[in-house]
């Protein structure tokens, strides 16, 4: 009897043990299945996120800026709604630029294109419009940012012919016009994001307005006899005319004859007649002609350069249009108030 009971107990124990093992195996299989399912979900989520990011990039307006200052304003107003491709890099003449294959592709695919005008990019027969025509771009997408600016002219020393001065953007008030016109163009092309462009433009325009007022105050405080800016090229005409300055330079129109003996002689005569206190050299020109003027006139070149055609590379001291305007007023005020 006792043996029978022992056998029954052993049998029951064995059944229970086998049942427990079966449950553990089922749980492990379920866990493994859940893990595989979750891993699959994670892979799908990663794939979806990548696709979404690609879609977001694809949704951005593809924008062309012809040179560094315009491209910087595009970034300020367009923000994360745009992808900008700058054509003329820092250190390159925007008048005679030769587009690269990448430039041509970007122009072909662009949603909107901004250029300065006033012949900075070579005019209607210049490199920019040849590229537009070659790409088959719709000219309704192409916007000049100087439509509201009255052109000023320079006389070529050799030919005595008048040419438009394209350096409008050195004047902060022209910067305001450019930003306003760019905002309006973005809204015309992308009306769904009107509020976004309005908000960013308003903030940027407030900063430009404050800079304009700073120019009025600080340049106004400079003694009248010092209100003469002498530079290598006559690029500062629009800004100086607005704030009541006289301009003199070595060459008026950029040619291969820059810094000729006759040009240097005429500028030295002007310096002596007007008791010019300081000379300036632009950041992107050959300093030797002005060094000759300084040596022969006895007037020093200011220790810091002044900016005209471009902003610096990212990370440099003057790598945005706002910094460019602030830098120039600091240099002029420091040099001419002494």
Give residue ranges: language-model regions.
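Sec-dependent bacterial lipoprotein signal peptides
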Residues: 1-19
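Extracytoplasmic metal-acquisition and chelation regions
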Residues: 6, 20-338
């Amino acid at each position: 009897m006792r043996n029978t009971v022992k056998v029954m107990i052993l049998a029951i124990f064995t059944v229970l043990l086998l049942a427990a093992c079966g449950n553990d195996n089922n749980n492990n299989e379920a866990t493994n299945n859940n893990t595989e399912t979750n891993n699959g979900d994670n892979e799908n989520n990663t794939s979806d996120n990548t696709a979404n990011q690609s879609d977001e990039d694809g949704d951005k307006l593809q924008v062309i800026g012809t040179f560094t200052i315009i491209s910087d304003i595009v970034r300020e107003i367009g923000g994360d709604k745009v992808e900008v491709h700058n054509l003329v890099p820092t250190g390159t003449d925007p008048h005679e630029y030769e587009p690269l294959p990448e430039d041509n592709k970007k122009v072909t695919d662009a949603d909107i294109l901004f250029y300065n005008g006033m012949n900075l990019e070579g005019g209607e027969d210049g490199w920019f419009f040849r590229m537009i025509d070659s790409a088959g771009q719709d000219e309704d997408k192409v916007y000049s940012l100087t439509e509201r600016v009255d052109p000023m002219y320079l006389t070529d020393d050799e030919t005595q012919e008048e040419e438009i001065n394209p350096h409008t953007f050195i004047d902060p008030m022209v910067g305001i016009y450019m930003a306003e016109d760019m905002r309006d163009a973005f809204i015309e092309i992308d009306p769904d994001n009107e509020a976004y462009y309005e908000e960013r433009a308003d903030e940027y325009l407030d900063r430009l307005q404050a800079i304009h007022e700073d120019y009025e105050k600080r340049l106004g405080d400079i003694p009248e006899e010092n209100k003469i800016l002498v530079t290598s090229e006559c690029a500062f005409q629009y800004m100086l005319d607005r704030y009541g300055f006289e301009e003199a330079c070595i060459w008026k129109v950029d040619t291969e004859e820059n810094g000729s003996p006759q040009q240097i002689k005429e500028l030295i005569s002007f310096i002596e007649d007007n008791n010019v206190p300081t000379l300036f050299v632009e950041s992107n020109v050959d300093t030797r002609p002005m060094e000759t003027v300084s040596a022969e006139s006895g007037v020093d070149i200011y220790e810091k350069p002044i900016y005209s055609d471009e902003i610096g590379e990212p990370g440099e001291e003057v790598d945005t249009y706002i910094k460019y305007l602030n830098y120039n007023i600091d240099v002029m005020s420091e040099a001419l108030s002494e």
